[in-house]
Amino acid sequence: MQQMVPASGYDRAITIFSPEGRLYQVEYAREAVRRGTTAVGIKCNDGVVLAVDRRITSKLIDVSSIEKIFQIDDHIVAATSGLVADARVLIDRARLEAQMNRISYGEAITVEALAKKICDIKQAYTQHGGARPFGLALLITGIDRHSARLFETDPSGALIEYKATAIGSGRPIAMEVLESKYDENMIVSEGMELALYALSKTTEELKPENIDMAIVKDSGKLVEKISVDEIEKIVKAVYKKVEAEEAEAEKNKVEEDIE
């Protein structure tokens, strides 16, 4: 008689499905993402925005050494959440794929093609023994001949295109903000403010020096990293907006109590 595999065995082997059809190692990899830094991506009428709260855990850390947004090609940029070492491997591979496309075909790779190549790599690591899934989610965005594109990849290799999305520990809260505030006709400057507004809801204090932000505009189609000084201006505007909302909510509460 065939001996049954203990339940605990299903979460040790990456290539074995549980009786419920689950790959536990992939789910554990997703948990690494859920514990990661919060990243927000927004597709605007004239470009795209990425913003990440780097979540500096010690005042002794050199903030400039913590990078969460990476330029892949002239027109493509990616934000990461999850295991830092895994991010380095996939970012290097993405850059390699982008350059190989230029050499082979004499043109820049499209955002969708690059995202699919990265997802193919991620998927392969869920199907072969002797390895583990990447504990990493990526937001891959940029401008190509199809205008602005924004893709999210998860540890299983799944690929979804969004108008606006978030990954990391603050995803549930950030998604609530995006679902209520996002407008397809907003411009990049408004998208930058919305991204930081969403991040402000996921943390006690939003510090400009801890924010990594990049944009790609339709006009230039080139990745542009946003300076700390500019981020600071937007953060101040965001907190003014938050204070105004809180004051309005308090006013409404008082009026309800009076009634």
Curated annotation (Swiss-Prot):
GO terms for molecular function: threonine-type endopeptidase activity. The formation of the proteasomal ATPase PAN-20S proteasome complex, via the docking of the C-termini of PAN into the intersubunit pockets in the alpha-rings, triggers opening of the gate for substrate entry. Interconversion between the open-gate and close-gate conformations leads to a dynamic regulation of the 20S proteasome proteolysis activity. It comes from the Archaea. One of its GO terms (biological process) is proteasomal protein catabolic process. SMART domains: Proteasome_A_N. CDD domains: proteasome_alpha_archeal (cd03756). SUPFAM superfamilies: N-terminal nucleophile aminohydrolases (Ntn hydrolases) (SSF56235). It is found in: Cytoplasm. GO terms for cellular component: cytoplasm; proteasome core complex, alpha-subunit complex. Gene3D superfamilies: Glutamine Phosphoribosylpyrophosphate, subunit 1, domain 1. Keywords: Cytoplasm, Proteasome. InterPro entries: Ntn_hydrolases_N, Proteasome_alpha, Proteasome_alpha-type, Proteasome_asu_arc, Proteasome_asu_N, Proteasome_sua/b. Component of the proteasome core, a large protease complex with broad specificity involved in protein degradation. The 20S proteasome core is composed of 14 alpha and 14 beta subunits that assemble into four stacked heptameric rings, resulting in a barrel-shaped structure. The two inner rings, each composed of seven catalytic beta subunits, are sandwiched by two outer rings, each composed of seven alpha subunits. The catalytic chamber with the active sites is on the inside of the barrel. Has a gated structure, the ends of the cylinder being occluded by the N-termini of the alpha-subunits. Is capped at one or both ends by the proteasome regulatory ATPase, PAN. Belongs to the peptidase T1A family. This is Proteasome subunit alpha. It comes from Methanococcus maripaludis (strain C6 / ATCC BAA-1332). The lineage of its organism: Archaea, Methanobacteriati, Methanobacteriota, Methanomada group, Methanococci. The gene is psmA.
